[in-house]
């Protein structure tokens, strides 16, 4: 009888254990889906740590190998010449070259192009993450009559090297926008760039589509001016150095290479998120961003693929110039886009079909003193893709 009861208890315990693990795994999967920002922060930190450890091992190995060679050659030289000359090995070493910026007494000329390395660009920025309202920002910059409606500004003492449209995808981040303007607007003025801000706001019930918002922002910005440089800027990324020059170049640029929440490490080589820049010509050549990424994740990886498929490489700032701080979030992030991996596997096939060339939208335009607001209600029907 006791043996029979034991047999009955065993399945019941197994069932309870199975229910417990099912509940735990379901809760974990739900958390990953609805709060991807937290989960992916830890994931990227682990990836970055792995890359750092790997690079350190390589560096240590190279140093040990070099010391062994130096010792061997030193012994040979001392035995032959009875001397201990320093050894000059014929191998390549990479050094971080210090960039020379112009002196304080540099003279500007209104008919000359503004240099890229200006004396006004000092380097580290004093970051203030305290929350403020747009009223405070409006009052702060209202004292500058050179800032025109929509946040348009250009230098008067030299000709801007780049005309830059700053595109900011936006939804329910009202506490972040003034913090970004407090730091970014003065930085761009010190860099002597001609610029304007475009806040592209998504309304409606669909998941956030960051990439499609960038495409909309591009189309609307080009109606205002013949911009030649585009900066795709997350609202919660604050640059820590004004020497991170927001101009474009011969290759697409990834500006935000070291983010504080990832321990200032690049999560993976193909990481292209946060803040990036392309010329108008480059952006059109790659057919813009994909429109098919609804929710968190994947669109930056697809952009990387598009850049590579078009024959470009990605440039990055040297050293600590690409450091950024991330404004803390007070709300849950966007849900995961679970279909991103299937789309990424078909990046090359989709590139000519999904992007600027299949984009449709209806925008409501309003003007703030510091930016042009482009409000759109996005749905998948606005960017349908034919079979590929």
Swiss-Prot record:
The organism's place on the tree of life at top rank: Eukaryota
Tissue-wise expression: Ubiquitously expressed.
Reaction equation(s) it catalyzes: a beta-D-glucosyl-(1<->1')-N-acylsphing-4-enine + UDP-alpha-D-galactose = a beta-D-Gal-(1->4)-beta-D-Glc-(1<->1)-Cer(d18:1(4E)) + UDP + H(+)
Topological domains annotated Cytoplasmic: 1-14
Pfam family, one: Glyco_transf_7C
Keyword list, A-Z: Disulfide bond, Glycoprotein, Glycosyltransferase, Golgi apparatus, Lipid biosynthesis, Lipid metabolism, Manganese, Membrane, Metal-binding, Signal-anchor, Sphingolipid metabolism, Transferase, Transmembrane, Transmembrane helix
Transmembrane regions listed in the UniProt entry: 15-35
Compartment(s): Golgi apparatus, Golgi stack membrane; Golgi apparatus
Named cofactor requirement(s): Mn(2+)
Up-regulation conditions: Up-regulated in subcutaneous adipose tissue during obesity and diabetes.
Bilayer topology annotation: Single-pass type II membrane protein
Gene3D superfamilies for this protein: Spore Coat Polysaccharide Biosynthesis Protein SpsA, Chain A (3.90.550.10)
Disulfide cysteine pairs (residue numbers): 114-158, 229-248
Keyword rRNA processing: no
Enzyme class: transferase
Main function: Catalyzes the synthesis of lactosylceramide (LacCer) via the transfer of galactose from UDP-galactose to glucosylceramide (GlcCer). LacCer is the starting point in the biosynthesis of all gangliosides (membrane-bound glycosphingolipids) which play pivotal roles in the CNS including neuronal maturation and axonal and myelin formation. Plays a role in the glycosylation of BMPR1A and regulation of its protein stability. Essential for extraembryonic development during early embryogenesis.
Full protein name: Beta-1,4-galactosyltransferase 5
Lineage: Eukaryota, Metazoa, Chordata, Craniata, Vertebrata
